[in-house]
Amino acid sequence: QAPWPDTISPP
């Protein structure tokens, strides 16, 4: 699981 939602891109 990524530390951000799958609906947004990482910084």
Curated annotation (Swiss-Prot):
It is found in: Secreted. Its main location: secreted. Expressed by the venom gland. One of its GO terms (molecular function) is peptidase inhibitor activity. GO terms for biological process: regulation of blood pressure. One of its GO terms (cellular component) is extracellular region. Keywords: Hypotensive agent, Metalloenzyme inhibitor, Metalloprotease inhibitor, Protease inhibitor, Pyrrolidone carboxylic acid, Secreted. The keyword Secreted applies. The keyword Cell cycle does not apply. The modification Pyrrolidone carboxylic acid is found at Q1. Belongs to the bradykinin-potentiating peptide family. This peptide potentiates the effects of bradykinin on smooth muscle, and inhibits the angiotensin-converting enzyme (ACE) in vitro. This is Bradykinin-potentiating peptide S. It comes from Lycosa erythrognatha.
